A protein has these predicted regions:
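Catalytic P-loop NTP-binding/switch module of NTPases
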Residues: 539, 545, 549-583
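A generic structural motif
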Residues: 207, 294-297, 347, 525, ...
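N-terminal beta-alpha lobe that positions the nucleotide/phosphoryl donor
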Residues: 1-278, 282-300
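C-terminal amphipathic alpha-helical interaction region
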Residues: 534-540, 554-555, 596, 604
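Catalytic cores of soluble metabolic enzymes centered on carboxylation/carboxyl-transfer
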Residues: 263, 302-522, 602-605, 639-645
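Conserved nucleotide-binding/hydrolysis modules and their immediate coupling elements
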Residues: 519-542, 548-549
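Structured functional modules or segments
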Residues: 571-649
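Structured core elements
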Residues: 10-11, 54, 83, 160, ...
Length: 649
C-alpha cells in the first residue's frame, strides 16, 4: 500500500493552535487551509492561512463544531488531511470517522482509541482492568441526581464532578457538601453539553495537595510507541492549567520510567497512533493514579518540544503519512528545563471572569534563544465572548529551572498588553513567588498563596502619579515641530507667553484618580517610549507607551493604564447603575431564574450567563424584590448591559 500523500492541510480550529500548526505545515512545504466563523473572519489564523473557508455562525456550535461544514471545507479547498488542534472536535470519535469516511486523513488517533479514552468513564474502566491505580469515584452510565448523591456519600466529600467527554476545566465543579450537589451537577452538565455536545458526568474523590504530572506519548502506525518525558501542570485555576513545565521538578529517573512505561502500555492497549498525553495525579509518597488520557496534542506541548528539540506537529504529519518514529526510547533527549504560562483575557481579581473587548495594545516579548511565544492575536483584534479566552503562551527554556524561570520573568516584563483585562500580572507573581522558585508545587498552589498572588489594590504613590503625569503630558499629540527642538512650538506642555510653563492634568488609573499641576523643570523626560525618572539622585528608565487617549506606564513590574479623567461623567455613570445588576462581560443568557415581583434572598441565582464556554451566575447582592427584567433566555448581551433591577426590602 502506497504512503498517503499530504500536500494541503486544513486546521479545524482557531487561535494560537491554528497558527502554530500552520507554521510547521508551511515549513514542511504544505498549503494551509483555515476555517473561520463569521466572528473570526479577520482573525489572525484566517489571515495567516494560504486558503480560508467561511463556516458562518458565531458560536462554536454553529461553526467549529459543525462536522459536515468542516468536511465540505476540506473538499472545497483540496485538503487531503485535517488537523483538529485541541478542544472543539479534537477528541470526537464521530469527527474522526467522518473524516475517514470522506476519504481524508485525520491527524490524530483512530476513532476506536478516541472512543476508548475520550470518555473518562470508559478510560477509567479500561485502566482498572489493566491494573492501573485509580482515584476512588463513580464512572457509571446512570446520570440522575440520586445516583450521584449516593456515589458522593460513598466516596466522601469533597468531590470533583467532571465531564466524561472533555477537559480544559469545562463541566468541572468541586462540591464541598450535599447542599451544593444539585446546582453544581446541573450547571456542569450544561457546560459539558455546550462545550462537547455530551452532558454525561463522572465524580471522583477530590484529593488534597496532589501534583498533576502528565506523560507525553507518541505512537506510529507500525506498533512503535515512545514517551517523551513528562510535564508538571500542577498550578491551575478553575481546574484549568495556567503554568506548565518540563521535566517535573524532583521526579526521580526511576519514577519517570515507571510513569512513562505505564503511559506507553496504556496507549498500546488501545492501538494508539499519534500524539497523546496520559495524565496522572502524583501524591507526596510518589504514588501515581491514572486520571485521564487526552487523545490529541496538548496546549502545553511546547515545553516538551523545548527539552527534546523535537517538533511534535511535524511528527504528527509524518506519522499520518505512514512514516515510522525517527528514534528509540533510549534516544529521546532531555535537555535543560522549560516553563510555559498561558496568557488569558480574564480578570483574576474577579474570580478569573473572562474578558472581552479590543486589544488596543499588544506587543510580544522579543524572540531569542530559549524564548518562544505562541499566540493567535495581534494588536487591534477583537476578543469575542464565543470562545476560550486564551490569547497565547509564553515559553522559556534554560539550562536549568532557575535560568528558565528568570528568562520567563524577563519575557513577562517585556510583554505589553492593554485594552482589556488579562492575567499577565498574576502570571508574573506566580513565577516570582518564592514557593514557585523552590518548586513547591501542587494543585492547591494558587488558593494557598491567593493573598500574595491576588493582592488588594494599594494606593498609588505620589512618585507614580508624578511620573504618570509627566509621561502623559510629554506624550500628548500636540507636539507640532519635530524638526526644531528649540522651537517653542515643539512642545505641547502648557507653555504660555510671559508665564512659566505649566499644565494641569486630571488622571485616572485602576479606579484611582489624581489632579496634578506640572511646572517646568521636573527631573522627568520622555524619549520615544523610554521615560527617564530621577528621584533622590537615582535615575531609572521606565517604559511609557502612548496608545490613543491612553498611556501605559511600566511601574513596579506592572503595566498600568492611565487615562484623562472626567469627574462629572464618572458621577453620572455611577448613578445610572444604582439598583441594577449588569452583565460582567459579553455573552448569551442561558437561564432566567426569576420573575418580576419575585422576592429573593441574598445570594440567590437570578440569571445565568454563558461566555467563553463557561457559565457565570448573576446573584442577588442582598435580599430584595425583582423590580424589572431586561433579558430573556437566548439573548446576546454586551458587557455593562442591565439584566435585572432589584429593589431592596
Amino acid at each position: 500500500m502506497s504512503a498517503p500523500v499530504i500536500t494541503t492541510l486544513l486546521v479545524a480550529n482557531r487561535g494560537e493552535i491554528a497558527c502554530r500548526v500552520m507554521r510547521t505545515a508551511k515549513a514542511l512545504g504544505l498549503t494551509t487551509v483555515a476555517v473561520h466563523s463569521a466572528t473570526d473572519r479577520d482573525a489572525r489564523h484566517s489571515r495567516e492561512a494560504d486558503i480560508r473557508v467561511d463556516l458562518g455562525g458565531s458560536k462554536a456550535a454553529d461553526s467549529y463544531l459543525q462536522i459536515d461544514k468542516l468536511i465540505a471545507a476540506a473538499k472545497a479547498s483540496g485538503a487531503e488531511a485535517i488537523h483538529p488542534g485541541y478542544g472543539f472536535l479534537s477528541e470526537n470519535a464521530g469527527f474522526a470517522r467522518a473524516i475517514e469516511a470522506a476519504g481524508l486523513i485525520f491527524l490524530g488517533p483512530p476513532a476506536s482509541a478516541i472512543d476508548a479514552m475520550g470518555s473518562k468513564s470508559a478510560a477509567k474502566a479500561l485502566m482498572e482492568k489493566a491494573g492501573v491505580p485509580l482515584v476512588p469515584g463513580y464512572h457509571g452510565e446512570a446520570q440522575d441526581l440520586d445516583t450521584f448523591r449516593e456515589a458522593c456519600e460513598r466516596i466522601g466529600y469533597p468531590v470533583l464532578l467532571k465531564a466524561t467527554a472533555g477537559g480544559g476545566g469545562k463541566g468541572m465543579k468541586v462540591v464541598e457538601d450535599v447542599s451544593q450537589l444539585a446546582e453544581a451537577l446541573a450547571s456542569a452538565q450544561r457546560e459539558a453539553q455546550s462545550s462537547f455536545g455530551d452532558s454525561r458526568m463522572l465524580v471522583e474523590k477530590y484529593l488534597l495537595k496532589p501534583r498533576h504530572v502528565e506523560i507525553q506519548v507518541f505512537a506510529d502506525q507500525h506498533g512503535n510507541c515512545l514517551y517523551l518525558n513528562e510535564r508538571d501542570c500542577s498550578i491551575q485555576r478553575r481546574h484549568q492549567k495556567v503554568v506548565e513545565e518540563a521535566p517535573a521538578p524532583g521526579l526521580t529517573p526511576e519514577l519517570r520510567r515507571a510513569m512513562g512505561e505505564a503511559a506507553v502500555r496504556s496507549a498500546q492497549a488501545i492501538g494508539y497512533v499519534g500524539a497523546g498525553t496520559v495524565e496522572f495525579l502524583l501524591d507526596a509518597r510518589g504514588e501515581f493514579f491514572f486520571m485521564e488520557m487526552n487523545t490529541r496534542l496538548q496546549v502545553e506541548h511546547p515545553v516538551t518540544e523545548a527539552i527534546t528539540g523535537l517538533d511534535l506537529v511535524a511528527w504528527q504529519i509524518r506519522v499520518a503519512r505512514g512514516e515510522a518514529l525517527p528514534m528509540t526510547q533510549a534516544q529521546v533527549p532531555l535537555n535543560g528545563h522549560a516553563i510555559e504560562v498561558r496568557l488569558y483575557a480574564e480578570d483574576p481579581a474577579n474570580d478569573f471572569l473572562p474578558a472581552t473587548g479590543r486589544l488596543d495594545l499588544y506587543r510580544e516579548s522579543a524572540q531569542g534563544p530559549g524564548r518562544r511565544v505562541d499566540s493567535g492575536v495581534e494588536e487591534g483584534d477583537e476578543i469575542s465572548p464565543f470562545y476560550d479566552p486564551m490569547l497565547g503562551k509564553l515559553v522559556a527554556w534554560g539550562e536549568d529551572r532557575e535560568q528558565a524561570r528568570l528568562r520567563l520573568l524577563s519575557m513577562l516584563d517585556e510583554f505589553a498588553i492593554g485594552g482589556l483585562k488579562t492575567n499577565i500580572n498574576f502570571l508574573r507573581r506566580i513565577i516570582a513567588h518564592p514557593a514557585f522558585a523552590a518548586a513547591e508545587l501542587d494543585t492547591g498552589f494558587i488558593p494557598r498563596y491567593q493573598e500574595q498572588l491576588l493582592p488588594a489594590p494599594g494606593t498609588l504613590s505620589d512618585e507614580f502619579w508624578q511620573a504618570a503625569a509627566q509621561a502623559f503630558a510629554q506624550s500628548l499629540p500636540a507636539r507640532k515641530r519635530t524638526d526644531d527642538p528649540a522651537s517653542p512650538w515643539s512642545c505641547g506642555s502648557g507653555l504660555r507667553a510671559g508665564l512659566p510653563a505649566e499644565i494641569t492634568l486630571h488622571l485616572s488609573c485602576e479606579g484611582q484618580e489624581r489632579a496634578l499641576t506640572l511646572a517646568a523643570g521636573a527631573h522627568v523626560s520622555l524619549l520615544g517610549e523610554a521615560l527617564a525618572v530621577e528621584h533622590d539622585g537615582v535615575r531609572r528608565t521606565l517604559r511609557a507607551i502612548r496608545q490613543g487617549d491612553s498611556l501605559y506606564l511600566q511601574w513596579e513590574g506592572e503595566l498600568r493604564r492611565i487615562e484623562a479623567h472626567d469627574p462629572i461623567s464618572a458621577v453620572e455613570a455611577s448613578h445610572s447603575h444604582q439598583g441594577g445588576l449588569t452583565a460582567p462581560m459579553n455573552g448569551s443568557i442561558v437561564r432566567v431564574l426569576v420573575e418580576v415581583g419575585q422576592a429573593v434572598e441574598a445570594g440567590a441565582q437570578l440569571v445565568v450567563l454563558e461566555a467563553m464556554k463557561m457559565e457565570h451566575s448573576i446573584r442577588a447582592p442582598q435580599a430584595g424584590v425583582v423590580k424589572a427584567l431586561y433579558c430573556q433566555e437566548g439573548d446576546m448581551v454586551s458587557e455593562g448591559s442591565a439584566l435585572v433591577e432589584l429593589e431592596q426590602v
